[in-house]
Amino acid sequence: MSYKCSRCKRDVTLDEYGGVRCPYCGHRVLLKERSPDVKEINVN
């Protein structure tokens, strides 16, 4: 799963045992990337 660091804005892929921390700047706040898929919902 892909995350983005909130401080340096780089894409981060987390390891299973690596913990939640940006490997580039050490910041601990990561934002989950949204999928690029567009969902359509029919409203009747």
UniProtKB/Swiss-Prot annotation:
GO terms for cellular component: cytoplasm; DNA-directed RNA polymerase complex. Its cofactor is Zn(2+). Its EC number is 2.7.7.6. Gene3D superfamilies: RNA polymerase ii, chain L (2.20.28.30). GO terms for biological process: DNA-templated transcription. Its main location: cytoplasm. The keyword Cytoplasm applies. It is found in: Cytoplasm. Zn(2+) binds at residues 8, 22, 25. GO terms for molecular function: DNA binding; DNA-directed RNA polymerase activity; zinc ion binding. Belongs to the archaeal Rpo12/eukaryotic RPC10 RNA polymerase subunit family. DNA-dependent RNA polymerase (RNAP) catalyzes the transcription of DNA into RNA using the four ribonucleoside triphosphates as substrates. Part of the RNA polymerase complex. This is DNA-directed RNA polymerase subunit Rpo12. It comes from Haloarcula marismortui (strain ATCC 43049 / DSM 3752 / JCM 8966 / VKM B-1809) (Halobacterium marismortui).
